[in-house]
């Protein structure tokens, strides 16, 4: 509830008396609540139907355990998807498109989000193109989640594909490239992301906190491909306290390559369980010199910092404090995505 005051005085009646007041009480609208299940009692039997019925105030969509074969588009703001199972693998949203059969990487996503304030909890999102088309001739980009919008939060979400698994993007900085610009903010907490070529890519300002980045077998594996349209925008990928896993099967694994000039990626306090190529990073179109690639406090059997082609300067006294979600994503509105995670876990625990 909030108090809204008008510049004009308004005549109101209270207990039979008439008073003049400049203020009225406004009730904050609540999001709709829907239940989705494959069968039985539910508001809807597909997730897309529930999304399509979301009002402007948003919707909390609880999804019963099961495998939902759907390609989902979310354009409304404040849509929250919550898996109602005991673990993320109990509720799976899956599809199998690619750039090859749709004509574009950006049409291949299993879930595509353009609404601000999107949240997801305790579920799995998969693109099965690479599993369904194992031949080399069919290799193609196949997005599982395309996410574009400010203040997105994902907690305990599994995102699985091959090439271009997670498109963590921002549409905020495509206009005037001569002025500073704040990119869309996204927070991934306790998530699992699997893929091989550029499997986390895009232009968002995204923090990955305590996530597992799992590399699939492939000749060349690039974990990230970050992008900026301008050196004045603040986008970047920040991997905080994450782990890098995958079989040591001969794949050449690097932390990332620059999709465009001024790519920005930080790995901080990473448990490197998989062997990483000693170079650490790879070139793409002579953009490496413009990029900001940093790696601090990596540890584990695959952490070998001696021969990195991009050297990380020593942290100055007190500089480590910037590697926190609160510092990185607060913005001008003091956003606190960690508080949203607590709310999401409460929603997942309710029945």
Please annotate each region the language model reported.
Residues 13-22:
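Bacterial N-terminal signal peptides
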